[in-house]
A protein has these predicted regions:
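Class I SAM-dependent transferase core
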Residues: 2-99, 107-111, 115, 130-141, ...
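Conserved nucleotide-cofactor-binding alpha/beta core module
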Residues: 91-212
C-alpha cells in the first residue's frame, strides 16, 4: 500500500513538472509567433486549442515547441508556425464553411473551427485509425462544428461544399482541379505543392475568371496519398 501511495505521489509530481514545462513553452511559442503572424484573431484561436491533446503521450513534453510532431501511422501534426501561416492566409469569416484534406489528429481543424463559430469545418482523413482518433479528441473538446469524414476515392468532400476555404494538410504534386471546383468563388485554398521532399505553400484564390496564386514560402509536409496525389502505399 505504501508503494502504491509513493507511486501516486511520484506521478503527481511528474505531472506538475510537465504542466510547468508546457506553460513555459506555450508562453515562449506565442511570443515567437507574434513576431511573424499579424492576425491577432488567428493567434487567439490557436491559444484556445490545447495542442498537447492532439499528440501521443510520449510527445506531450514537446507539444509547444515550434516543430512538427509524429502522431502515428507515418503522419505528423504540423509545426505551429505553419498552422498559423496557413490559417492567416485563409482570411476566415465567422460563418465560413471550411474543408480540410488530411485531418491527422484534428489539430488544424480545431484551430479553423475556433475562427468559424457560425460556420462549419469538414475534415477528411484516409487513415481510418487517425480519423477515429480525431473524432474522439474533438468530441472530448466539444467541437460541435467539426465533421470528420473517412476519405474515399473522391478527393475532398464535394457533397458538403462548396467551401469558402480549403486547407490541404499534406503535400500534393500539383494543384487539384477537383478541389478548386469545390471552392466557392472568392474562396481561398492553401496547399503545399512540390515533390515528396520539399514543397512551396501556395494560396489559391478562386475568382470569376479562374484562379490567382500567391506563394507563402517553402515548407515540408508528409505526402498526400490517394486520387490526384502521390501513389498510395496502403
Amino acid at each position: 500500500m505504501l508503494t502504491a501511495l509513493c507511486n501516486v505521489i511520484f506521478e503527481s509530481m511528474q505531472e506538475q513538472k510537465l504542466d510547468k514545462k508546457l506553460f513555459s513553452d506555450r508562453k515562449a511559442l506565442f511570443s515567437k509567433l507574434r513576431n511573424s503572424i499579424r492576425s491577432g484573431s488567428v493567434l487567439r484561436a490557436m491559444e484556445r486549442v490545447p495542442r498537447e491533446a492532439f499528440v501521443p503521450t510520449g510527445e506531450r513534453p514537446m507539444a509547444y515547441l515550434d516543430i512538427p510532431l509524429a502522431i502515428g501511422d507515418g503522419q505528423t501534426i504540423s509545426q505551429p508556425y505553419i498552422v498559423a501561416l496557413i490559417t492567416e492566409a485563409l482570411r476566415l469569416q465567422p460563418a465560413d464553411r471550411v474543408l480540410e484534406v488530411g485531418a491527422g489528429s484534428g489539430y488544424q481543424a480545431a484551430v479553423l473551427a475556433e475562427l468559424v463559430p457560425e460556420g462549419s469545418v469538414v475534415t477528411v482523413e484516409l487513415v481510418r485509425s487517425l480519423a477515429q482518433r480525431a473524432r474522439d479528441i474533438l468530441d472530448d473538446l466539444d467541437y460541435g462544428n467539426i465533421v470528420v469524414e473517412d476519405a474515399n476515392e473522391t478527393l475532398g468532400c464535394p457533397w458538403r461544399g462548396p467551401y469558402d476555404a480549403i486547407v490541404v494538410s499534406a503535400a500534393a504534386p500539383s494543384l487539384s482541379s477537383a478541389l478548386i471546383n469545390q471552392l466557392a468563388v472568392g474562396g481561398r485554398m492553401v496547399v503545399p505543392v512540390g515533390d515528396r521532399r520539399q514543397q512551396e505553400l501556395v494560396c489559391v484564390l478562386r475568382t470569376g475568371e479562374g484562379v490567382s496564386l500567391r506563394m507563402l514560402g517553402p515548407c515540408r509536409f508528409v505526402p498526400l496519398i490517394g486520387r490526384e496525389a502521390f501513389p498510395t502505399s496502403f
